[in-house]
Amino acid sequence: MLIHPQFDPVAIHLGPLAIRWYGLMYLAGFIMFLWFGRLRIRQPHVAARGWTTRDLDDMLFFGVLGVILGGRLGYVLFYKPSYYLSHPMEIFKVWEGGMAFHGGFLGVVVAMWLFGRLRRRHWMEVTDFIAPMIPCGLAAGRIGNFINGELWGRATDLPWGMIFPQAGDNIPRHPSQLYQFAGEGVALFVILWLFARKPRPMGAVSGVFLIGYGAFRFAAEFAREPDNFLGLLALKLSMGQWLSLPMILAGIAMVIWAYRRQPGAGAPQPAA
């Protein structure tokens, strides 16, 4: 049995300014996105499509806005709509926590669609480009969750079960944040990076991301404690699982569509 180390959520104190670990993890995710993005631009089939470091920097700006706005609105709408309906001003207090990946994902899709319109690229060409780097941010975010001692798992008697004092019950639990780090972060990154090393039909890389994330998240939710204000929903599945199922189905549909359409695996596509 292990005990959560109880990290101080504030990593650095600079006078009245407190820099939190969770914010540093977001920063680490953005840095890894840029670093691996520059490596991706050097791949011959990617360079042939005219991607530049300026595109990458601009995509990060659009993506950050999509993550923050979509993640916050997703949390409000998917998890606590009644609370925020009664306390609308609380929606703007992003620094107090409360982000949802599925909302952030939708926000990024919209942001990449807008970016594609500005660059005259099809939105799926844009999402195909960024998909292999997204797990970097997911991995960093899950480490942030672990440092904060939040989003802990369900009770377990396994040797690596961990007591999270914030849970308030002194029961060993799955360190589900680390499971998600390993699945949604490390494993998904490896799968996507290897898959995207060769030219693929437009939409295929994005589809594999949807399938991979949805599957890893769906599996991890069996070890993660359901949100106490929601519990388990129909068929004893969590909200995270119900939101992941459409992602898996959409990903399968995109991969099938991409390979049936076969526009020429590496050919640039017109803007939509």
Swiss-Prot record:
GO MF, any single term: phosphatidylglycerol-prolipoprotein diacylglyceryl transferase activity
Record GO biological process: lipoprotein biosynthetic process
Bilayer disposition of the protein: Multi-pass membrane protein
Record's keyword terms, sorted: Cell inner membrane, Cell membrane, Membrane, Transferase, Transmembrane, Transmembrane helix
Binding positions for a 1,2-diacyl-sn-glycero-3-phospho-(1'-sn-glycerol) per the UniProt entry: 142
Metabolic or biological pathway: Protein modification; lipoprotein biosynthesis (diacylglyceryl transfer)
Keyword Transferase assigned: yes
Main localization, broad class: membrane
HAMAP family assigned: Lgt (MF_01147)
UniProt name for this protein: Phosphatidylglycerol--prolipoprotein diacylglyceryl transferase
UniProt source species: Cupriavidus taiwanensis (strain DSM 17343 / BCRC 17206 / CCUG 44338 / CIP 107171 / LMG 19424 / R1) (Ralstonia taiwanensis (strain LMG 19424))
